[in-house]
């Protein structure tokens, strides 16, 4: 198999565009600023969208590499590494929060 031939972006490009537009919306900005005290960083959604579109147009190896999360320092980027291998975002129940309905 040629390099990159069997690889596809984990989501359709339309999903990245929708996430980027949501991230840039006024409502999201206000909620994020209220909770975190800083502007939301939407650049990764924009880069993911650009990589996805480049992949659809050219099947570019650079687009594939750009969509992979960074590996530990000095190690290559690995598909499936990161907060959530499908969406690339942390879910609400990751970290110290208890799952919904847990009354402990």
From Swiss-Prot:
Oxidoreductase in keyword set: no
Biased composition (Basic and acidic residues): 95-104
Subcellular location(s) per record: Synapse; Synaptic cleft
Residues covered by region (Disordered): 58-104
Assigned GO CC terms: synapse; synaptic cleft
Alphabetized InterPro entries for the sequence: Pants/Emi1-like
Post-translational modification: Rapidly degraded by proteolysis following neuronal stimulation, resulting in increased AMPA receptor clustering.
GO biological process entries: negative regulation of long-term synaptic potentiation; regulation of synaptic plasticity
Pfam families: PANTS-like
Keyword annotations: Secreted, Synapse
UniProt keyword Ligase present: no
Tree of life domain: Eukaryota
Subunit-structure text: Interacts with RTN4 isoform A/Nogo-A; the interaction results in enhanced RTN4-mediated inhibition of AMPA receptor clustering. Also interacts with NCAM1, RANBP2 and CCT8.
Protein's job: Negatively regulates long-term potentiation and modulates adult synaptic plasticity. Stabilizes the interaction of RTN4 isoform A/Nogo-A with its receptors, inhibiting clustering of postsynaptic AMPA receptors at synaptic sites. Upon neuronal stimulation, degraded at synapses, reducing RTN4 signaling and allowing AMPA receptor clustering at individual synapses.
Family from the record: Belongs to the UPF0545 family.
Name of the featured protein: Synaptic plasticity regulator PANTS
């Amino acid at each position: 198999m040629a390099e990159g031939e069997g690889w596809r972006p984990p989501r359709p490009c339309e999903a990245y565009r929708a996430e980027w537009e949501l991230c840039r919306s006024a409502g999201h900005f206000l909620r994020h600023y209220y909770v975190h005290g800083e502007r939301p960083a939407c650049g990764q959604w924009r880069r993911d969208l650009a990589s996805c579109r480049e992949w659809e147009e050219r099947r570019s190896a650079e687009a594939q590499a750009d969509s992979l999360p960074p590996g530990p320092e000095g190690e290559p980027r690995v598909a499936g590494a990161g907060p959530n291998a499908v969406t690339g975002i942390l879910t609400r129940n990751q970290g110290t929060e208890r799952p919904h309905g847990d009354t402990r």
